[in-house]
Design a protein with these regions (language model features):
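Acidic, metal-coordinating catalytic cores used for nucleic-acid/nucleotide bond scission
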Residues: 140-148
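Long, low-complexity, Lys/Arg-enriched
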Residues: 1-135, 150, 156-416
Length: 416
């Protein structure tokens, strides 16, 4: 099956970008952003834009809630897309700014680990929705401050998660355009956006400068690279948020992490494929259970005593990730302090959030390699299949080959 491309791009404020002739391999595209040249070069099935929630301040009216902040930021960015994309989405992540607006001072505060956690979630979840094998690309041309660095870190980690979830080598590419050149003031003015029609320049006879569009990185990411990102603070690994006092799902999440995530991730990192299969089989069997079964869906506030040990499923993980994000968003509501309107997260993502993502990826990969019809039995064929989880590490695959050879030898002796 041939692969397709999903592209991610990080944006600052697009209102002030000027028209350019972006060039790659001799071909040029006139546009206010690199989206058009990215689309031409990569022909992506889908493009996901990552923007900051601080763009909400560009809207004329006052912000009233965090949902309002997200919608204003998304609508503002969408107005400037100006590209013929078959499919695109805009994801709004937490930003940092202090800005005077009217009679108030708006202060946006954010923890950069929250930005990274949400970017990781969005990139990974967008990727696994596709049935066909993917190549992943990232454009950091228009990111500002911390955004390109954090998004690249998350993109790389998400590619590793995607690779293990699909048991494949995943090709990634990263692009960045050259800086926009300094022009004469009159020329620069002509190349600015027309405020009434932001997808056209102020002057139709403007001649935009050539700006090179560069491929910065092209690499293969292998499943084993997930282990680069495994490592948790003991005191926070069993929770997805720092403050769980009013989070009804916390006890169920804690149970899932204790009973499935930590043993599964540990077994994977150690190359303990027998334990890996024994841990995964009940969870994958629960995947096919009815919604009324304990492992099928979790009600808010359900305690860990309601769910039998090891009956957690991929669906449970997805539900808990979504609920953790919803709970985090509830703590980012705007509030007034004197003449300041502050948007600040009262909660933060804890290491357990990343542990759930890693569990989801590893479990998804195992799902394609073993049978769940016989819960108590792990076959030699399944162990040989599980070796595919370790693509990218010659050392681990060599050690597993030796262990499997021993088991094969013992099997032969038993059958003699």
């Amino acid at each position: 099956m041939s692969s397709q491309v999903i592209a991610f791009a990080v944006w600052g404020n697009p209102a002030y970008w000027r028209l350019a002739n972006y060039k790659s391999n001799g071909e040029g595209v006139k546009s206010f952003s690199t989206l058009e040249i990215l689309s031409q070069v990569e022909k992506p099935k889908k493009v996901i834009l990552i923007v900051s929630d601080t763009l909400a301040l560009e809207a004329p009216d006052k912000i009233t809630s965090y949902d309002d902040v997200v919608e204003k930021a998304r609508s503002y960015a969408e107005r400037y897309v100006c590209s013929h994309l078959d499919e695109f989405e805009i994801k709004v992540l937490p930003g940092v700014i202090r800005k005077n607006k009217g009679n108030a001072v708006y202060v946006f505060k954010a923890d950069m680990d929250d930005f990274r956690s949400l970017a990781l979630y969005e990139i990974y979840m967008q990727s696994i929705r596709e049935d066909r094998p993917l190549e992943l690309t990232l454009d950091i041309s228009h990111g500002i401050n911390y955004m390109p660095t954090l998004t690249y870190d998350s993109f790389r980690e998400a590619a590793a998660l995607y690779s293990v979830s699909r048991i494949q080598r995943t090709k990634i590419r990263v692009y960045q355009a050259d800086p926009y050149p300094i022009l004469q003031k009159e020329t620069e003015e002509k190349l600015k956006r027309d405020e009434s029609s932001p997808c056209t320049p102020k002057s139709q006879d403007a001649h935009p400068p050539d700006v090179a569009y560069n491929l910065l990185l092209e690499e293969n990411v292998y499943p084993w690279e997930v282990t680069r990102y495994i490592g948790f603070q003991k005191q926070k690994v069993k929770q997805t948020l720092n403050d769980v006092r009013n989070f009804p799902e916390h006890e169920s999440i804690k149970s899932l992490i204790e009973e499935l995530s930590l043993p599964l991730i540990g077994a994977y990192r150690l190359g303990a494929i027998v334990q890996l299969a024994l841990l995964a089989k009940p969870a994958l069997a629960a995947e096919g259970a009815s919604a009324s079964a304990s492992g099928g869906s979790i009600n808010p506030g359900q305690s860990d005593s309601c769910a039998p040990k090891a009956n957690w499923s991929l669906k449970d993980i997805e539900v808990f990730l979504k609920r953790s994000i919803e709970e985090w968003r509830k703590g980012r509501e705007p509030f007034e302090d004197g003449n300041e309107i502050i948007v600040e997260s009262k909660n933060k993502f804890a290491p357990g959030f990343r542990a759930l993502l890693q569990t989801h990826a590893i479990l998804s990969g195992i799902k394609s390699l073993i049978s769940t019809s016989e819960l108590e039995m792990v076959t030699l064929t399944e162990l040989k299949n599980l070796k595919k989880l370790y693509q990218g590490s010659k050392v681990v695959t060599h050690l597993l080959d030796r262990e499997i050879e021993k088991l094969d030898f013992l099997k032969g002796k038993i059958l003699e």
